[in-house]
């Protein structure tokens, strides 16, 4: 039986069931080993179909790219994108390197985006250029005009002090 604690939206269940001592990457590696040729994801918008081997190869490439940019274990990586293949890759790539994935609502406008990035301490933001009528890159330029002159990986924004890099 679960019960609310202090009337908040936190619920604590039974603690008698042991935790699974596996990481997401180790679990996926095991699934890949057993079922690498099987379908892992189908993206109806793009028509792409990925097996577990495809998914993990792509996620490993993104993880290597993030590491080469200076993203490490414990860093917060935001993704501001609609549901797309890149979102899935980012989820697995950040888990692979031990970075913390911060999901940014694709409908956010500038004030909500600023709050989310500041509050979560996002140092790297992976973003789509736009979503529907929302110009993501324009909103980022409004929030961080320093983008116009910053060297890649060396953004220093007054409004977004933790953000160092934007990946598109």
Residue spans of the language-model regions?
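Conserved AMP-binding/adenylate-forming core of the ANL superfamily
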Residues: 20, 37-92, 109-114
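Short, flexible loop segments at the rims of nucleotide/cofactor-binding pockets, characterized by
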Residues: 16-19, 54, 102-105
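Hydrophobic alpha-helical segments typical of transmembrane helices
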Residues: 23, 27-28, 112
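Ligand-binding pocket scaffold of soluble enzyme catalytic domains
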Residues: 20, 30, 99
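Aromatic/hydrophobic pocket-lining residues that form π-stacking "cages" and hydrophobic walls in ligand
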Residues: 28, 90, 140
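Flexible, non-catalytic linker and terminal segments flanking ANL/adenylate-forming cores
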Residues: 1-22
């Amino acid at each position: 039986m679960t019960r609310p604690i202090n009337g908040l939206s936190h619920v604590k269940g039974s603690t008698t069931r042991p935790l699974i001592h596996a990481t997401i990457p180790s679990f996926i590696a095991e699934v890949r080993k057993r079922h690498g040729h099987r379908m892992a994801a189908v993206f109806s918008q793009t028509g792409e179909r990925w097996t577990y081997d495809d998914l993990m190869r792509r996620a490993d490439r993104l993880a290597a790219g993030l590491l080469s940019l200076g993203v490490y274990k414990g860093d917060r990586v935001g993704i501001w994108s609609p549901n797309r293949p890149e979102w899935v890759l980012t989820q697995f790539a950040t888990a692979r390197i031990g970075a913390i994935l911060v999901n940014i609502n694709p409908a956010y406008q500038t004030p909500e985006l600023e709050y989310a990035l500041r509050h979560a301490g996002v140092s790297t933001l992976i973003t789509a250029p736009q979503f529907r009528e929302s110009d993501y890159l324009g909103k980022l330029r409004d929030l961080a005009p320093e983008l116009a002159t910053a060297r890649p990986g060396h953004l220093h924004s007054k409004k977004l002090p933790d953000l160092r890099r934007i990946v598109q």
